[in-house]
């Protein structure tokens, strides 16, 4: 619906603002399926289980970066509290990618505005990924593999084309799962991830950290559409 598209636009722009407001020397490029399809980079059928349009397209990041340098992928429901350059400072060339290795087992049967919650090992590891785009092992993760209908979401989201030693760790503060990690027991967040749903959904209007998100929306003069 136009309302859901409007909500999507708001939280994507808000997430981008939280990145660029604290980091002036970065480029942010949304993964838009229409653009990727136009460029013959993405041609998979719609994923019925996918809760976002980048369920599969996130794995095109190494190719989109011409298999060179480091790039960050993050879900669009994150609120960055700190300069993302401090995250890039953690990169280590021995790894093909780096992520928060959550021990996360959600209980909810649905998420995000009614989408089914799919349970699998390494849940949410792929929601914030530092990609070493030039790593030899990431040459396997190209448009042909990503678009192959036999390539499952579980294969990709578990990083199954990599050996375990090729996956580096970053501190959980950079992918702080709201409602899972707790302050002060687990420290303090550097990037808040509203993984179960955020204040842009009616049934999550007052979720944990809801006011931080609303304050950012107000500051950037974004308007929540009526539902």
Model-predicted segments: where are they?
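Conserved small/polar residues in nucleotide/adenosyl-binding loops
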Residues: 6-14, 220-226
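Active-site-proximal specificity loops/subdomain of glycosyltransferases
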Residues: 29-61
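Short, surface-exposed amphipathic charged segments that create phosphate/polyanion-binding patches used
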Residues: 41-49, 111-116, 184-187
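Conserved catalytic core of nucleotide-sugar-dependent glycosyltransferases
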Residues: 92-153
């Amino acid at each position: 619906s136009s309302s859901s598209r409007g909500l999507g636009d708001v939280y994507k722009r808000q997430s981008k603002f939280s990145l660029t407001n604290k980091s002036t020397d970065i480029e942010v490029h949304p993964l838009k399926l229409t653009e990727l399809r136009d460029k013959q980079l993405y041609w998979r059928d719609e994923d019925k289980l996918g809760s976002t349009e980048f369920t599969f397209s996130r794995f095109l990041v190494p190719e989109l970066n011409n298999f060179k340098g480091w790039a960050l992928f993050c879900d669009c429901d994150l609120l960055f509290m700190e300069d993302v350059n401090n995250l890039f400072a953690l990169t280590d060339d021995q790894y093909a990618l780096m992520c928060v290795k959550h021990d996360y087992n959600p209980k909810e049967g649905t998420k995000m505005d009614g989408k089914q919650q799919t349970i699998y090992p390494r849940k949410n590891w792929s929601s914030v990924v530092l990609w070493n785009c030039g790593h030899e092992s990431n040459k396997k993760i190209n448009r042909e593999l990503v678009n192959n209908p036999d390539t499952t979401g579980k294969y990709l989201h578990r990083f199954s084309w990599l050996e375990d030693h090729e996956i580096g760790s970053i501190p959980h503060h950079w992918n702080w799962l709201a409602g899972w990690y707790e302050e002060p027991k687990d420290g303090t967040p550097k990037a808040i991830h509203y993984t179960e749903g955020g204040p842009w959904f009616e049934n999550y209007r007052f979720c944990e950290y809801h006011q931080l998100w609303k304050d950012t929306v107000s500051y950037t003069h974004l308007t929540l559409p009526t539902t």
